[in-house]
């Protein structure tokens, strides 16, 4: 009879230890990032007239088909890709870039590029095929990094290739972490959209 209080105290102590242990090992919640709302165009507008542009979905390699936030340590092993454990993009990178292109151009009344929805493709317009080949954060050392994306753009008309180019943009981060990488990637993507528009304006009309 006298041992019951001792056993009860032992049981409560064990339960408390398990509770504290469970709290200590609880997984950190994931943080998700996108590019935020479209921004108004700044700087000098690109003056040119273009036919309607059909933009299918952007393609990407298998390594970019998930929503993992990738980075490389150039000072350690630049051939190895890493992924942040507790940070994710809100959607795969190719979808993020496609959405940004459409929202940025639609938000800019001075943009010469008139995108056509996939379901309403204009056979007389241009076909713009984009392949996302890089979308990563690069660390030059433990405290400095930059975001980089690269697109291969192919311009077609009536299934004939008119022009092709590779566009690359980088933006430095203000901190060596995932949130700063996401912010820098947005800056780099917006700059690349400007480059893409300029490249399209240089192409002769079919």
Where are these regions (language model features)?
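Bacterial N-terminal signal peptides that target proteins for export
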Residues: 2-12
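C-terminal motif of bacterial Sec signal peptides marking the signal peptidase cleavage site
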Residues: 19-22
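Short secondary-structure boundary motifs at beta->alpha junctions and helix caps
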Residues: 78-88, 158-198, 205
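Sec-exported extracytoplasmic/periplasmic mature domains
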Residues: 102, 106-110, 197-205
């Amino acid at each position: 009879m006298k041992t019951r209080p001792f056993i009860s105290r032992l049981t409560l102590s064990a339960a408390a230890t398990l509770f504290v242990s469970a709290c200590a090992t609880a997984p950190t919640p994931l943080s998700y990032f996108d590019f935020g709302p479209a921004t108004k165009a700044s700087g000098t507008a690109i003056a040119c007239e273009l036919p309607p542009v059909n933009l299918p979905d952007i393609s990407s390699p298998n390594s970019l088909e998930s929503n993992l936030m990738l980075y490389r340590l150039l000072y350690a092993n630049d051939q190895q890709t890493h992924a942040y454990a507790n940070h994710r993009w809100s959607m795969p990178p190719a979808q993020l870039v496609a959405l940004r292109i459409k929202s940025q151009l639609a938000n800019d009344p001075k943009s010469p590029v008139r995108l056509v929805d996939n379901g309403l493709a204009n056979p007389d317009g241009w076909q713009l095929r984009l392949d996302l080949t890089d979308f990563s954060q690069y660390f030059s050392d433990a405290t400095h990094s930059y975001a980089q994306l690269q697109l291969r753009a192919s311009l077609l008309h009536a299934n004939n290739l008119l022009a092709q180019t590779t566009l690359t943009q980088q933006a430095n981060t203000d901190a060596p972490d995932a949130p700063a990488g996401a912010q820098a990637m947005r800056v780099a993507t917006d700059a690349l959209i400007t480059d893409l528009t300029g490249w399209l304006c240089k192409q002769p009309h079919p």
